[in-house]
Each structure stands twice: as C-alpha cells, then as structure tokens.
Amino acid sequence: MLSRLMSGSSRSLEREYSCTVRLLDDSEYTCTIQRDAKGQYLFDLLCHHLNLLEKDYFGIRFVDPDKQRHWLEFTKSVVKQLRSQPPFTMCFRVKFYPADPAALKEEITRYLVFLQIKRDLYHGRLLCKTSDAALLAAYILQAEIGDYDSGKHPEGYSSKFQFFPKHSEKLERKIAEIHKTELSGQTPATSELNFLRKAQTLETYGVDPHPCKDVSGNAAFLAFTPFGFVVLQGNKRVHFIKWNEVTKLKFEGKTFYLYVSQKEEKKIILTYFAPTPEACKHLWKCGIENQAFYKLEKSSQVRTVSSSNLFFKGSRFRYSGRVAKEVMESSAKIKREPPEIHRAGMVPSRSCPSITHGPRLSSVPRTRRRAVHISIMEGLESLRDSAHSTPVRSTSHGDTFLPHVRSSRTDSNERVAVIADEAYSPADSVLPTPVAEHSLELMLLSRQINGATCSIEEEKESEASTPTATEVEALGGELRALCQGHSGPEEEQVNKFVLSVLRLLLVTMGLLFVLLLLLIILTESDLDIAFFRDIRQTPEFEQFHYQYFCPLRRWFACKIRSVVSLLIDT
C-alpha cells in the first residue's frame, strides 16, 4: 500500500514542470505547470501576475534545442512545443505591435509596450535618424530618472545609459540637452506616452527582422508591421506592401514567397531565401498571424492556411487569437481602477545596462573611422555571401550598402525610404530568428569586429557565451572555408527544379502503373463490353493471358492455399 502511494506521488511529481518567463523589465516569473498544460494556461497565469487585461498584443517566445526561436502556440501543449529538458525558460514579449500605441486603454499596457520598444531601440531593430534618436533617448531618460538635477546629474551623465548599439559623444550631448531644456516636469507616464507617439511615426516601428537573402544573394531583413510587409536592406526600406495587397504567403524548404496584387491588376511574387527550413517556416507562420491580426475584421474570418504544393502535403497553420479590431472593441469596455505600476527606474537592466558604456565613436577621427569601416566591410564580403551567415548591415560612417533588389517584380514605383542617417546606424542588431549552424559564432564575431558588446539577455536566450579573442581569430580563419562550402540561391533553385522534375516523373510512373493494373483486371474479368472484347481477341492479349497471367494466377493461388493450410494446422 505504501509503495503504491509513493509510486503515485512520484508519477504526479514527474508530470509537473518548472517554467521561468523573463519579463520585459528583466525580472523573472516562475511557475509550475502540468505535463498536458496548454500555452493558453501559462499565458493566462503570466497576465494575471502582471495584472494585464489588454493581453492580445503580447506573446511568449522560446528557443528550441536547435536554436530556432518560436512563438508559443496557445492551443498546444507547452511541454511538447519546447522539446527541451526542464526547467523551461521563455520570454514575454510584444507579438503584435498596436497600430497606435498611444490609444491603448490602460497605462500598464502602454508601459509594457514602452519597455519593448526601448528594447528594440537598444538591439537595433528600431532604426531612426539622429534627431529622432536623441529625442527618444531623452524621453527614456526623463521616464527613468526624472527631471534634470545639477546636483545629482554631473556632466556626461547621459553616457551612463546604453540606449543604442552604438553612440557618440555628440549624440550624448544632444540627449542631455533635450532632457535638460525640453522635458522638465514630465511624469514617467507622460514621457512614456510621448515616446510611444514618436516611435509610432518611424518607418521601422514594430519591425521584428528575419534575416534572409534575395534571389541575387544579397542580404535582406524581412519583417511584418501593423501596416504591412517590409524589406530592409542596408539602412533603407526597399519594399513596403500593405496588408490588403498581400494575397498569399507560402514557403517551400528555405524559400519564402509573397504574392502581391496591386492596382491595375498587377500581380507580383517576391521570393526570398531563409537560412534554414525551420527559420523559413517560422517566418511564414509569423506572416500568417500578422496578416490575420491586422487585416481581418473578426476572428471568425480566420481560415486554416496550407503551404502544400501539387503533389506533397505541406504545413498547415491557423491563427487562434482575436484580431486587432476585436481587441480594440474589447479594450474600450474595460472599466476598473488603473492598476499600480512598478517601474524599473534606475535598476540596471540586462537589455539596457545603466552603467555599461557602449562603443563610443568619437575617439577616432572621422576620416580614419570611415577607412577602418571600409576595410572591415571588405573583410566581411565572404561572410555576407554565405547562406549560413548572419547578414551584416553597413555602418553609418561609410557609403551605404544597398544591393540591387531583384525579384519577380520587373517594374516598381516604390520609393526607397531612408530610415537611418550617417550619425546613427545600429549595425549590431540582435536577430530574432537564429540562422543555421555556425551562425551564432559568426554573429558574435561580427559584433566583436564592430566593437559592440552582447547583452546578458542575448547570452541567455542563445545559451552561448561570447567567444574569446583567440576563438575570434580561429573563427576568422575558418570563414572563407565555410563560405566556399555553401551554395548560393541560384544553385539551390537548380536543385529544387531537378527535385520537382523527379517528383513529377515518379508520380507519372506511379499513375501509369496503377492504370495498367486496372486495365489488366478489367480485361481479365467477365465484364462484357465491346471495347474489352476487342482487346481479348487480339493475339497479343492471348499470348499475355496464357504465357504470363495464367501462370502468375496459379502461383498466387498455390501460395494462398499453403498459407491457409498452415494457419489451419496451427
């Protein structure tokens, strides 16, 4: 009896798993879930802990054992999705950026979105020009330390905060000047609201970049925003497709297709190549979810989307949440006392270390910095050409690297939007989707060359540490060998064409074989049809019937009788 109770209790313990979720303010929430707990259960626990009602904009992100990032699906089991050993570690992040963050109903929601965009600014996902960068950083400063006080804030106090991947003394002085003269008297809530209003006007607001390559092999970043699909190359936005113009999203292997229908019945297919099939599928699922959330009027219009082709079954996916319009209508009905907000304040965060000095660019003369940058970019040409590398954007101190975009689109009337100027270029963007094998090392190597430091969050999410100087030199020596071993998109397209031809040939042969068997069965049957009577009277059929079909039939009958008799005897 005692052993039975002990075994039952041990089984119940094995069915419970510890989960740690890192929040946007870098604190952690730990809970225990059952083995069969769905993602919705964990998400509801988290939102209850945060006292969050407008929760549809947020999601939980995790990294699988292959270093591929995913959004937790709320309709599926948490344990089955993670595929890793407990305890589980995940991150709470903004999944769908509100089209107008200032219009959010509750201050707690605005504060969480503010933390996400501040993180985007630091990691290089939110690109902007110098004047906009200084204003955004000043808003953050006002929200975190309050009004300027000469007794508390000595000269150069703004340099103690890391707002961007890179910064200069000139930018620091501009931030401090705005903070001193323009923002005095603003409360944290007001500064955060002004920050959101400014960020929402930027071209890269809501961008969660996926590293890819175009058909020419040039590095590109694909992203989905509240307003449509964007493609970024260098420091420019080269494509912007509104959601009502996107007719279909599809992927096959590492190839991602975007079908576009514009005015005057112009149909376009944009083609890009992801580093791995898993990264391409993640990109496709993100596109399906974003299109459903921002484009549809109600969730009942959501349909299951398939990536299948003519002969083979592909992936199927369905967005399971509410759409943006429904979320706004639900938010308008919220009537409660505003919850208390515990702001992080001056506590050093893992994503924005308050005391850590980032790379400052004024210690080297401008002309020399430009020459150094050009030599670095020349050394990284092979890295950019590798399908397994992390695409590297050019920094702001040299000529802007903007490769020619080639796709199925022959004529484009789009204007190329410059999203960052020479004084500010976050070249060390933390990519949301890990690339293939060796990609993490290559990304860290490029960051070492550009002089940027990895945040603690990046190290934890990637589960890898920054390489030492010796490791960096060793990796640098292996770059050319790695790059020479990887084929480009053109060779990949040829391989895909050959595979498709082989598939078509196999399917055709299979169909012919089935038709031949069906014809033999019908002609050997007693079916009295003129067509089959004519076939039976031909010399060829009589020869086939007596020399091949009849002996084969007798052989099968003999085998069947022997098997039956064996079964009866046993």
From Swiss-Prot:
<dbReference type="Pfam" id="PF08736">
    <property type="entry name" value="FA"/>
</dbReference>
<comment type="subunit">
    <text>Interacts with CTNND1. Interacts with ITGB5 (via cytoplasmic domain) and ROCK1.</text>
</comment>
<keyword id="KW-0965">Cell junction</keyword>
<dbReference type="GO" id="GO:0005178">
    <property type="term" value="F:integrin binding"/>
</dbReference>
<dbReference type="Pfam" id="PF09380">
    <property type="entry name" value="FERM_C"/>
</dbReference>
<dbReference type="GO" id="GO:0005856">
    <property type="term" value="C:cytoskeleton"/>
</dbReference>
<dbReference type="GO" id="GO:0008092">
    <property type="term" value="F:cytoskeletal protein binding"/>
</dbReference>
<dbReference type="GO" id="GO:2000146">
    <property type="term" value="P:negative regulation of cell motility"/>
</dbReference>
<comment type="function">
    <text>May be involved in regulation of cell migration. May regulate cell-matrix interactions via its interaction with ITGB5 and modifying ITGB5 cytoplasmic tail interactions such as with FERMT2 and TLN1. May regulate ROCK1 kinase activity possibly involved in regulation of actin stress fiber formation.</text>
</comment>
<dbReference type="InterPro" id="IPR019749">
    <property type="entry name" value="Band_41_domain"/>
</dbReference>
<keyword id="KW-0812">Transmembrane</keyword>
<feature type="region of interest" description="Disordered">
    <location>
        <begin position="344"/>
        <end position="367"/>
    </location>
</feature>
<keyword id="KW-0225">Disease variant</keyword>
<dbReference type="InterPro" id="IPR019748">
    <property type="entry name" value="FERM_central"/>
</dbReference>
<dbReference type="GO" id="GO:0030334">
    <property type="term" value="P:regulation of cell migration"/>
</dbReference>
<dbReference type="InterPro" id="IPR000299">
    <property type="entry name" value="FERM_domain"/>
</dbReference>
<keyword id="KW-0991">Intellectual disability</keyword>
<keyword id="KW-0597">Phosphoprotein</keyword>
<dbReference type="GO" id="GO:0031032">
    <property type="term" value="P:actomyosin structure organization"/>
</dbReference>
<feature type="domain" description="FERM">
    <location>
        <begin position="17"/>
        <end position="298"/>
    </location>
</feature>
<dbReference type="InterPro" id="IPR014352">
    <property type="entry name" value="FERM/acyl-CoA-bd_prot_sf"/>
</dbReference>
<dbReference type="InterPro" id="IPR014847">
    <property type="entry name" value="FA"/>
</dbReference>
<dbReference type="Pfam" id="PF00373">
    <property type="entry name" value="FERM_M"/>
</dbReference>
<dbReference type="InterPro" id="IPR029071">
    <property type="entry name" value="Ubiquitin-like_domsf"/>
</dbReference>
<dbReference type="Pfam" id="PF09379">
    <property type="entry name" value="FERM_N"/>
</dbReference>
<dbReference type="GO" id="GO:0005912">
    <property type="term" value="C:adherens junction"/>
</dbReference>
<keyword id="KW-0472">Membrane</keyword>
<dbReference type="InterPro" id="IPR019747">
    <property type="entry name" value="FERM_CS"/>
</dbReference>
<dbReference type="GO" id="GO:0016020">
    <property type="term" value="C:membrane"/>
</dbReference>
<dbReference type="InterPro" id="IPR018979">
    <property type="entry name" value="FERM_N"/>
</dbReference>
<feature type="compositionally biased region" description="Polar residues">
    <location>
        <begin position="388"/>
        <end position="398"/>
    </location>
</feature>
<dbReference type="InterPro" id="IPR035963">
    <property type="entry name" value="FERM_2"/>
</dbReference>
<dbReference type="GO" id="GO:0019901">
    <property type="term" value="F:protein kinase binding"/>
</dbReference>
<dbReference type="GO" id="GO:0045785">
    <property type="term" value="P:positive regulation of cell adhesion"/>
</dbReference>
<dbReference type="InterPro" id="IPR011993">
    <property type="entry name" value="PH-like_dom_sf"/>
</dbReference>
<feature type="transmembrane region" description="Helical">
    <location>
        <begin position="504"/>
        <end position="524"/>
    </location>
</feature>
<dbReference type="InterPro" id="IPR000798">
    <property type="entry name" value="Ez/rad/moesin-like"/>
</dbReference>
<protein>
    <recommendedName>
        <fullName>FERM domain-containing protein 5</fullName>
    </recommendedName>
</protein>
<feature type="region of interest" description="Disordered">
    <location>
        <begin position="385"/>
        <end position="407"/>
    </location>
</feature>
<feature type="region of interest" description="Interaction with ROCK1">
    <location>
        <begin position="308"/>
        <end position="353"/>
    </location>
</feature>
<keyword id="KW-1133">Transmembrane helix</keyword>
<feature type="modified residue" description="Phosphoserine">
    <location>
        <position position="375"/>
    </location>
</feature>
